[in-house]
């Protein structure tokens, strides 16, 4: 729900005509758009809640991934940390000195949509041990992570290839970690509510229209 105390402000220009943006956005919402669908409760995640039971009691997790493969889950964890009773460590670069090395085993979420991200592969080879439990999230095609999952006999979750990194937080990439954090992932799927909120919808149109106006007229900060 959107708090009534939130004031939607924008940087609109009075010269902007937003009717075309409104028309295109209305058409887009009515179309069968898989990326938009991933933001709603209609999207079906490619993981089974029953299969995650063996991980639910675990308290320590590592999320190994670069860019959009980990930033969404990291944002959720940072924002809702006061509600989360588990520890999540995010390995999103090649500096791993801050990781607790004394711990004998971890539950690893290894995420790369292409399955061939070099930094992720390097960290995986440096960090994971035989006794670790691993879940790998990647596209359903021949790649390094799928081969690794077979070798480790690890759980594999296939990520839909039509959802890019910056849009992936509400797909398996962000929702699987959120589920393991003990959060209700349905609470994140608010698209259907937002598009019915006139204030949100009108401000979205206004902001997009203004952005296009400034770009077309080469007005940059």
Which residue ranges define each predicted feature?
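Glycine-rich phosphate/diphosphate-binding loops that line cofactor/substrate pockets in enzymes
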Residues: 48-59, 100-105, 211-219
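Generic detector of well-ordered alpha-helical segments enriched in charged/polar residues
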Residues: 22, 26, 37, 49-53, ...
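Acidic catalytic cores of enzymes that act on phosphate-bearing nucleotides/polynucleotides
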Residues: 41-44, 51, 183-189, 197-221
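Short, structured coil/loop segments at alpha-helix boundaries
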Residues: 6-14, 18, 29, 107-110, ...
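Structured N-terminal alpha/beta-domain signature
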Residues: 12, 28-30, 35, 40, ...
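Extended, charge-enriched "interface" segments that sit outside catalytic cores
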Residues: 1-47, 52
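Generic structural motif recognizing short loop/turn segments at the entrances and edges of beta-strands
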Residues: 1-4, 32-35, 85-87, 152-153, ...
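Glycine-rich phosphate-binding loops that contact phosphosugars or nucleotide phosphates
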Residues: 56-199
């Amino acid at each position: 729900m959107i708090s009534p105390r939130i004031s939607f402000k924008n940087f609109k220009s009075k010269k902007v005509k937003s009717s075309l943006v409104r028309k295109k956005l209305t058409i887009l919402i009515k179309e069968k758009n898989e990326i938009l669908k991933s933001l709603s409760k209609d999207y079906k995640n490619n993981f089974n809640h029953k299969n995650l039971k063996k991980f639910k009691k675990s308290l320590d997790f590592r999320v190994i991934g670069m860019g959009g493969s980990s930033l969404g889950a990291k944002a959720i964890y940072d924002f809702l940390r006061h509600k989360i009773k588990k520890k999540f460590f995010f390995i999103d670069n090649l500096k791993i000195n801050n990781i607790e090395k004394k711990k004998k085993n971890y539950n690893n979420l290894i995420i790369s949509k292409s399955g061939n991200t070099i930094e992720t592969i390097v960290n995986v080879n440096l960090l994971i041990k035989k006794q670790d439990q691993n879940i790998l999230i990647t596209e359903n095609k021949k790649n390094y992570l799928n081969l690794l999952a077979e070798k480790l006999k690890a759980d594999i979750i296939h990520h839909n290839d039509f959802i890019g990194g910056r849009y992936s937080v509400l797909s398996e990439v962000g929702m699987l970690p959120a589920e393991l954090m003990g959060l209700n992932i349905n609470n994140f799927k608010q698209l259907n509510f937002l598009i019915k909120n006139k204030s949100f919808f009108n401000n979205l149109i206004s902001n997009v229209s203004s952005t296009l106006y400034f770009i077309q007229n080469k007005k940059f900060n």
